[in-house]
Amino acid sequence: MKKIIICFIFVFSINVSFADATSELIDKIKNIHSMTANFNQKLIDGQTNNNLNSKGNMSLKKPQYFKWITTSPNNQEIVSNGTKLWIYDGDLDQLIIKKVSNDIAQFPYLILLSKNTNNINKLFTVTAQDNNSYILKPKNDQMIDSIKIKFTPNNQLEYLEISTSLNQFTKIEFNNVKTDVDISNTSFDFKAPQNTDIIDETKFA
């Protein structure tokens, strides 16, 4: 009987710990209403042993707007106004237009735009670490193994780490972070440069 009680207390304490970690993370994400930052991104492909470093700038505004601009080594822009998603490759002069998807596996930073942050509890098992960071383990997603979100002492986003089932690891470090800034909604509409090859997948969806 004593063993059963001890096991129950242990399991209960784990569940409480997960709940506390999830609540802490949700509170931090809720406090990010808008954000701009520069980023440095490192992709390590465990299958090919190739590394890819890139950098650029980003902005987001709840509940649905984000912009991700890579300036080096290639020119690429990913922009969404909540309805459409534009993926522009400046080197290829090509633009792909898609309907907005909530696919976190494709764009892990979408978790910061979650309209209903309580869904984090449904999608992930969250554990807190001592250095103001959180490990998210998907409950169903087969593509992502884990997401790590690290905050600074004043609760600004410091970095994201994403590990996938394809043995790929991505770390995105943020600097010059500004939160709760005034960003116009129209800045999240994309206008293609002249002579751009446009593939509009929304017409076939």
From Swiss-Prot:
Coiled coil: none annotated. GO terms for cellular component: outer membrane-bounded periplasmic space. Keywords: Chaperone, Periplasm, Protein transport, Signal, Transport. Belongs to the LolA family. Gene3D superfamilies: Lipoprotein localisation LolA/LolB/LppX (2.50.20.10). It is found in: Periplasm. The gene is lolA. This is Outer-membrane lipoprotein carrier protein. It comes from the Bacteria. Participates in the translocation of lipoproteins from the inner membrane to the outer membrane. Only forms a complex with a lipoprotein if the residue after the N-terminal Cys is not an aspartate (The Asp acts as a targeting signal to indicate that the lipoprotein should stay in the inner membrane). GO terms for biological process: lipoprotein localization to outer membrane; lipoprotein transport.
